Amino acid sequence: MNFIENESAQKLRGGYYTPLDLAVYIVRWTLDNNPKNLLEPSCGDGIFIQALSEMELPIGLSFTGFEILAEEAAKARDRCKNEPRLNSSIHTRDFLEWAINQMVDGNSKFDAVVGNPPFIRYQYLPEESQQKAETIFKMLNLPFTMHTNAWVPFVLASISLLKPGGRLGMIIPSEIVHVMHAQSLRTYLGTVCSRFLIIDPEDIWFDGTLQGALILLAEKKNSPIDHSDGLGIVKVVGRDFLSGNPADLFNNTARINGKTVVGKWTKALLTKSERELIDSLYEHTDVHRFDQIA
């Protein structure tokens, strides 16, 4: 176990910036829905703004970005100045604090959210930030754990601020698939999203870290009572997938829902026949949980 005084400044601020080709891929998918306004909750030096500048943009697209570090926010503003097609505003402030106010008032809703939220252990966050993270969970009536990570409340708040039918595209830690502290997020995605896709790479995308990361693409339900098609997971090797249309992966990947997405998502990596075999073993009269016999 590492102590906070032994961690690097980069790790303590969770700043692992997105490669441009991945940002372009995510932006391409969110723009496919013809958004009028777009949110980035942790814009860093503005790499997603750069990605937007390489795309054909909807007329009058509004971009709202947040970055807590003034030096990085200034870089993002410089990128905005070079993209006159965007009606952009970059705020140097805490996104979670702003998001809590918006969730209370219900004033701001977005057609799309993109980004790469900070990867920071809860224990390394300032006390004020810890309280804001816990508040996000409480506002969404989700169980909270102090084992969480900053990226989890960032994603929760971002989905909450999406309009019905809105899209979210983010790079997040691969631990979303299995860790207990992401269970509330997995549950929330399964409840409020009509479809969501994990693009899970074999490679490490960020230099200088062993942290695995993946792409999450999610589409919010138009109505809370709508059916959810659930989760799809695509394993990729290398970056060849980036030359394809993200909409093809999102629309054509086989999905699972129901009890399979209630817990850990590792079952989604199995074939349908493998899942059916495991389910039949669970229900077999001669198979028992360990806590039932010990």
Residue ranges, per PLM feature:
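Short, conserved SAM-binding/catalytic segment
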Residues: 76-87
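Conserved SAM-binding strand-loop segment of SAM-dependent methyltransferases
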Residues: 85-95
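N-terminal, positively charged/glycine-rich alpha-helical extensions of SAM-dependent methyltransferases
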Residues: 1-7
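Signature of N6-adenine DNA methyltransferases within the class I
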Residues: 11-12, 16-25, 42-52, 57-61, ...
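Conserved class I S-adenosyl-L-methionine
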Residues: 35-42
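Glycine-rich helix-loop-beta junction characteristic of Rossmann-like nucleotide cofactor-binding loops
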Residues: 28-33
